[in-house]
Amino acid sequence: MAANNFATKLSRNTNRITVILVYAFLEWLLMFFIFLNSFFTYFIVKFASFFGLKQVCLLCPKLDRIFERKPENRFTYKELLCQNHIAELASLSFCRTHGKLSESANLCSDCSNREEEQSNIGLGFCTCCQKSLADKPYPNYLLLKSSIWGKTLGDREDGGLILEMIDDDKFGDGFEIDRESYPLGFFRDKAEEGKKQDQQQNGEVISDVESYGLSLREVSEEDGLRSIISNNSPGNEAKSRVSEDEQRNDDTSNVATYGEDQISGRVEEKEEETGVADLLYDQFESKNFTGSQIEEEEEDREETTKELDPETPTSVSTLFNKKLHFLARNEYAAAEDAGDGNVLVSEMDGGDPLRTIERLRETVRAEQEALRDLYAELEEERSASAISANQTMAMITRLQEEKAKVQMEALQYQRMMEEQAEYDQEALQLLNHLMVKREKEKEQLQRELEVYRAKVLEYESKAKNKIIVVENDCEADDDDKEEENREEDNSSEMDVDLEKITLDCVQHMSMLGESLSEFEEERLVILDQLKVLEDRLVTMQDKESAEDPGEFSNSYEEASNGHGGLTMASMAKSLLPLLDAAENESEDGSQGLPESDEKNFGSDSEKLEIIKQVDSVYERLQELETDGEFLKNCMSSAKKGDKGTDILKDILQHLRDLRTIELTNTIENQTTQEE
């Protein structure tokens, strides 16, 4: 109650999350205490076992006796045990003889201490004393005696029955018979109680029924009495399967034969008694069961049915056993209702044998009707089981078909996935090949780029060397040759510009037009320079003609008359041999020349310089014209596409090679001249 009060107060005063957190903490704390308790319990058990002490009961050390004064507030054993351990303890029994706890289902007669459990003894060993349970394979004999048959045994005069219990332990060693007499009303009450129980219980249905053998033994041969002995031993049990139709036919034939013998032949009383006894022997051999046997078989059948068919609500064997039990009780009740005081048959009191036969026939008919009803119920159950089996088989076949379809679909999807995987593998291989190819192309381009870089560096170094050489040449010249050096510088710059223009022509085609216009401008400038030089040359020739008209007038007239279409360059070239001869003469006899001739020599040298300049200008002009035509051709070829660019690249490479050759030649010439 304290815990409930605490829970109610906590739930009222706080919110739900706080309650959950508090109880979570309390559960963890409880688990910790349980762990400590189990740890100390384990330590106590190990301590006692290690030192050989007596084990302590786990339920004895309780402090509620000290803290709780009132007994109703103390904890009981039921509250301290869980359901699993209570069920485990409930399945055990205490043996007072040996002082042990053992399974109650497997106890011998000495350990169980209960007479009702002796009928459940079977094969195996006792769970308490390990004694074999097969030492007493069947229970005590139950002997049913009528008032007439039991005279030698001292039965009662009021027609009561005498029950004799024969113990197997005393059998064969001068045993004593313990007798107890019961009135007939006792058995009537038992029969009525059995009927009520049969009506209240529900039968369970299964497919086959085992037959149990019953044995009859004679107790006293002198009196000619026969007793019904029920033997439940597994070793003496005769398991024979006989159909009910044959039994009914045998019973009917025996009854009919016996009736005819009684009516026609009127045989002796002893023969009549023997026939009735045989008839009872045949009937009770297949139908008569004791109460303990039927209960045992019902329990066994229920367990077997639960194991084999847990979903079936009824069992054939249980119903069949109940029917047989009911028929056996009806036989006893019919015999008792006759009022002759006999349990088995009524003719032993001096009744009419025909009446007995009629009663037996009625009994047989009742049994046959009961058997027919039973067979009808069996057929219904069989048909129901057949229908359920057919439905189950149909369901199984449908499930198998669905399983096959699912397997086929799974295989199809698996094939599709495998094919897709193959396609993916092929695509990956192609991509790998492409990647390798691209890598190779990339490496090749990198190599070409390195080659081009090396060539560019080489060309730059050559251009620098050329510029250095030109600068050195310019510094070595005199002040008078400044103009020539400037022109040479311009020519070198123009050469460099040409190389750059050719490169730009390959890379940038839009610059070609501008370069052509620049060439035209340079051409015009060069033509102007040529005109100036020609004018100077003409003035110088006029002066010379005035001084020495005999030599140059003829040559000039021939040049002007015979070669009117020639340019000033051809005229200058024609004068070169004379100028060279004059230079040689001047070098050889420079010291011996008179002072009057120094002026003439200076004028001749100036003429030679002018002629050289004119020749160089004309050469540059021709080069510019050729370069202009080349650029025009390059522009026309560049318009053709990739082939034109390839051709331009090849031409540019050849031009560079030629330029390097020219530079090397000029450098060698300069070195030789300096030497």
From Swiss-Prot:
One Pfam family hit: Zein-binding
Entry's Gene Ontology molecular function annotations: myosin binding; myosin XI tail binding
Annotated coiled-coil segments of the chain: 605-633
Keywords for the protein's UniProt record, in alphabetical order: Coiled coil, Membrane, Transmembrane, Transmembrane helix
Region span, Disordered: 225-274, 286-315, 474-497, 542-565, 582-605
Cross-referenced PANTHER family: MYOSIN-BINDING PROTEIN 2, MYOSIN-BINDING PROTEIN 3
Functional note: Membrane-anchored myosin receptors that define a distinct, plant-specific transport vesicle compartment.
Domain GTD-binding span(s) in chain numbering: 355-453
GO cellular component: membrane
Main localization of the protein described in the UniProt heading: membrane
Membrane topology: Single-pass membrane protein
Biased composition (Basic and acidic residues): 238-251, 596-605
Compartment(s) of residence: Membrane
Acidic residues bias spans: 474-496
Transmembrane segments: 17-37
Gene disruption: observed consequences: No visible phenotype. Myob1, myob2 and myob3 triple mutant has a significant height reduction and a delayed flowering. Myob1, myob2, myob3 and myob4 quadruple mutant has a significant height reduction, a reduced rosette diameter and a delayed flowering.
Superkingdom: Eukaryota
Record protein name field: Myosin-binding protein 3
Quaternary assembly: Interacts with myosin XI-K.
Record comment regarding domains: The GTD-binding domain is sufficient for myosin binding.
Keyword Transmembrane helix assigned: yes
